[in-house]
């Protein structure tokens, strides 16, 4: 082989190699946007959470998608199954009972939000002393809010419980009822809507807000601010340390979110962090 031919072959081979390198070098794909899907209760709490989503987008580039629920039956199952990444709609006593009843062993508390005090509402009385003998009173029927409501009634001097510290008390634990109040358990989601038919309803802020009631403005009596029922953010053991979950927690625990909560609940909301 002549020297000129050898140089020509070498040059062609080099060109092919360089061309191949150029073709293989592709632009890097843009990183997928950080996303999180969070379950919330409909009403004012959802509106408060939307501010957390705004903070998350501005500070961390996190896209937050909320899924609304009208009751507490499904949000924990949705997180456990992976349909949601997290939820922000309950307190620890409720989570403990729900997880135990449904065997949701992969749920974990990752942060606190607010304490939303429980309150007693009425269209017939302005003061608890106006409650007549045999008056109709409704309390939530889910285990934790039921006990919470009964403890609140005891603090108003209306009843006495077997154990005032038992968060899972039921109407069967009432040992004194001097006014012979007719205390009935109803579904948590309908307690506030029963006000036309009863003398007093003990309702949590989620459902009170859905019918336009505010604990401080409309409550006959309100739970103390030192309540142990701080609301929480819940995720799973497999995603609790993920950037999306941690950034959402930081976004929720901000002054912007607290200010929005005060707009909706006034003095009826207390920081839990």
From Swiss-Prot:
GO annotations of cellular component type: cell outer membrane; plasma membrane
Membrane topology: Lipid-anchor
Main location per the UniProt record: membrane
CDD domains recorded: PBP2_lipoprotein_IlpA_like
Segment forming the signal sequence: 1-20
Listed GO biological process terms: D-methionine transmembrane transport; methionine import across plasma membrane
Lipidation residue positions, type S-diacylglycerol cysteine: 21
Protein location: Cell outer membrane
Role this protein plays: This protein is a component of a D-methionine permease, a binding protein-dependent, ATP-driven transport system.
Protein name: Probable D-methionine-binding lipoprotein MetQ
Organism of origin: Haemophilus influenzae (strain ATCC 51907 / DSM 11121 / KW20 / Rd)
Lineage, broadest ranks: Bacteria, Pseudomonadati, Pseudomonadota, Gammaproteobacteria, Pasteurellales
